[in-house]
Amino acid sequence: MKHRCFEPYDALTVGEAMFVKEEILPQFIGDQGYFSTIFAFEPCHAYRKGKNYMDYDWPQPFDDWKKETFHNQKIIEKAGFEANIIENHDQPRGASLFIPEEDYGFYSLSALAMIMLCQRGLPFLYQGQEIGMSNRRWEYAEFNDLETINQYHIAREAGMSEEQALKIASHHSRDNARTPMQWNHDENAGFSTEKPWMPVNENYKIVNVKDEEKEYGSILNFYKRLIAFRKSGEYNEILTYGDFKPMYEEEYHIFAYSRSYGDQKLVLICNFSSEEKSVELLEDYESVVFVNYEQTTVIGNRLQMKPYECVVYEKR
């Protein structure tokens, strides 16, 4: 199929393939693979500790997420490029899965965006991710997804109360990613004048495209700046083709890695937590090239990081 359908048109194909072993990755991606790339599901699924919702962690455990990301980056590098994601139509919203509810906001959302878009690979954004769409609060009768309904009953049969089962189902339901896009303040978030197939998230008057387009400090406009940074002439090649190397692997709630290409090097350091952190800088860096706060603070050789601060340094 690849040779007859895709190659004549130089088509980019993306496969849904999970837990592909390192030794057979070249069969799936790259010049000789079935597809151009496959989605990087493993880091997003690090919270799944069993077969049922009630076995899953919530929110996503930081160490498991970081470990899976670093592992994926290591094994994929020789085979080709993976399609990096934070969320998709079969998962809860990344803004809720990766970020504790009390920490939801611009800095946590922008840190999550930087961690993903600066990795090696092909970044995919899912509709609504760019404005920070999150999970909604559900009543049992509102669920549309059969998996969610089944998981609710599995939790009840295991002895959980209605409230507990509903909470678990609400966290993990795929319906969270399938609510209508939030365009503006109008009825049904501007998606349709007719009743949509499922309820709109109640936060649509706060989280919507129209408001965020007008606000420079919105997560939507941050995504635009971050994408422009990745595509810029100065950094496009290193962020596309550069080697990926994990850093600060033992530092809890510090997500860091370097990208190297020729004589150019970038280092991303992120404090993915609600507490301030002090991080030792392992090298002298020439400049800060991207950050989600207005400024960074360095005292001696230590970076004093604010909650959810994420910074990209350059070293030549």
Predicted regions and their residues:
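Active-site and adjacent substrate-binding regions of carbohydrate-active enzymes
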Residues: 1-286, 291-316
